[in-house]
């Protein structure tokens, strides 16, 4: 293990944050450590505790000019079986292969450390920079996400705060640092479908209506439906059934009801209303007795090539020598809430190969490179 004195400022802070067991929605004083450092270099700090969630908003600079915000989360997912880890999950150990090991190393305490150190350096090097550097940090990203970034964004909108550009520190890289950045995400629309039949005895099917039999053709049609073609930035919209439940557990009883959980990951070529209408039409066509409860997790968003994406790509190229690939693949992130402010949003962070897994880890040296990428992006946009 590398001795603490040998660690860079970024790695020292990353290890400090990882050693705090901030399983969602607990923050475990991670934000206090970040705010202490940001406050020491002149950031204006605004803690926002909403229900059981810790958040903070911090800014440095004048009211005039563009705003570049770093966004992220201090909460992590549970470790899973601790005995399956090679090292203690919250030990923040750098192993013989130079890997920083621990829950949150990739998702996303490493990025948080890089953001803070890059911003410290930038405001000291450019104390009179144009516009503002901002931070929007939450402890409610891995959980329900009701009282975190979403709620903070609503407060910022209510007082007419402006965010021009936002870098979310989600682990976007796939094989090498900076090989992929996320310049958008698909929308996520979930539903619980209930199809009602009539319970009865399996020996007397004429006296019952089997909801499994009734639902099967409709579900098959939904699964086979071609929802859209996608576009240059998004793949076609996908429909997936994740759960089917029916039956009493007895082998001689026709069930009276079936429930199905399904999810759309949808592109900008489809709308919530359009998808809902098409589902309703298919269910009605099969003459089912049905009801559905919809849950929208987030709308699709896209940051097209422009100032932010260009600056990030140039910084990655300058630091690593590699060309980045913009992508909209993967799940949702808090970027979906920030994008509703009309903000250009890009996700850039470490390699995501072990996120949410036992033995989460990243190459420790990547964090110093990530700090430099964030710093160079600040220089390009606000110096």
Swiss-Prot record:
Its EC number is 3.5.1.18. Homodimer. GO terms for molecular function: acetylornithine deacetylase activity; cobalt ion binding; succinyl-diaminopimelate desuccinylase activity; zinc ion binding. Zn(2+) 1 binds at residues 73, 107, 170. The lineage of its organism: Bacteria, Pseudomonadati, Pseudomonadota, Gammaproteobacteria, Pseudomonadales. The active site is at residues 75, 141. Belongs to the peptidase M20A family. DapE subfamily. Keywords: Amino-acid biosynthesis, Cobalt, Diaminopimelate biosynthesis, Hydrolase, Lysine biosynthesis, Metal-binding, Zinc. Pathway: Amino-acid biosynthesis; L-lysine biosynthesis via DAP pathway; LL-2,6-diaminopimelate from (S)-tetrahydrodipicolinate (succinylase route): step 3/3. Its cofactor is Zn(2+); Co(2+). Binds 2 Zn(2+) or Co(2+) ions per subunit. NCBIfam families: dapE_proteo (TIGR01246), PRK13009.1 (NF009557). InterPro entries: ArgE/DapE_CS, Bact_exopeptidase_dim_dom, DapE_proteobac, Peptidase_M20, Peptidase_M20_dimer, Peptidase_M20A. Pfam families: M20_dimer, Peptidase_M20. The gene is dapE. It catalyses: N-succinyl-(2S,6S)-2,6-diaminopimelate + H2O = (2S,6S)-2,6-diaminopimelate + succinate. The keyword Zinc applies. PROSITE patterns: ARGE_DAPE_CPG2_2. PANTHER family: ACETYLORNITHINE DEACETYLASE (PTHR43808), N-ACETYL-L-CITRULLINE DEACETYLASE (PTHR43808:SF31). This is Succinyl-diaminopimelate desuccinylase. Zn(2+) 2 binds at residues 107, 142, 356. GO terms for biological process: diaminopimelate biosynthetic process; L-arginine biosynthetic process; lysine biosynthetic process via diaminopimelate. Catalyzes the hydrolysis of N-succinyl-L,L-diaminopimelic acid (SDAP), forming succinate and LL-2,6-diaminopimelate (DAP), an intermediate involved in the bacterial biosynthesis of lysine and meso-diaminopimelic acid, an essential component of bacterial cell walls.
């Amino acid at each position: 293990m590398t001795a603490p004195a040998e660690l860079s400022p970024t790695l020292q802070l990353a290890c400090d944050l990882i050693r705090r067991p901030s399983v969602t929605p607990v923050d475990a004083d991670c934000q206090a450590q970040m705010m202490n450092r940001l406050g020491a270099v002149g950031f204006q700090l605004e803690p926002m505790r909403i229900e059981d969630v810790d958040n903070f908003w911090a800014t440095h600079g004048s009211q005039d000019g563009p705003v570049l915000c770093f966004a992220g989360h201090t909460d992590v997912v549970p470790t899973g079986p601790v005995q399956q880890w090679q090292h203690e999950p919250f030990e923040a150990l750098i192993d013989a292969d130079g890997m920083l090991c621990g829950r949150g190393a990739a998702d996303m305490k490493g990025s948080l450390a890089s953001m803070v150190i890059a911003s410290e350096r930038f405001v000291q090097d450019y104390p009179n920079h144009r516009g503002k550097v901002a931070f929007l940090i939450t402890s409610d990203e891995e959980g329900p996400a009701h009282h975190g970034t979403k709620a903070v964004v609503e407060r910022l909108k209510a007082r007419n705060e402006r965010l021009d550009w936002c870098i979310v520190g989600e682990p976007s890289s796939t094989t090498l640092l900076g090989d992929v950045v996320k310049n958008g995400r698909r929308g996520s629309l979930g539903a619980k479908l209930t199809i009602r039949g009539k319970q009865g005895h399996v020996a007397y099917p004429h006296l019952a209506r089997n909801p499994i039999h009734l639902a099967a053709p409709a579900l098959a049609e939904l699964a086979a439906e071609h929802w859209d073609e996608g576009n240059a930035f998004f793949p076609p919209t996908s429909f997936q059934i994740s759960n089917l439940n029916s039956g009493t557990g007895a082998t001689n009883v026709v069930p009276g009801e079936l429930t199905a959980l399904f999810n759309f990951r949808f592109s900008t070529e489809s709308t919530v209303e359009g998808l809902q209408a098409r589902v309703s039409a298919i269910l009605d066509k099969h003459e089912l007795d049905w009801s559905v409860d919809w849950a929208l997790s987030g709308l699709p968003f896209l940051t097209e090539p422009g100032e932010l994406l260009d600056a990030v790509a140039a910084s990655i190229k300058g630091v690593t020598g590699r060309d980045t690939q913009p992508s909209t693949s993967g799940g949702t992130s808090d970027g979906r809430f920030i994008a509703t402010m009309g903000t250009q949003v890009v996700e850039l962070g470490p390699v995501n190969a072990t996120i949410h897994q036992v033995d989460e880890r990243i190459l420790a040296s990547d964090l110093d490179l990530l700090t430099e990428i964030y710093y160079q992006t600040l220089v390009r946009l606000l110096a």
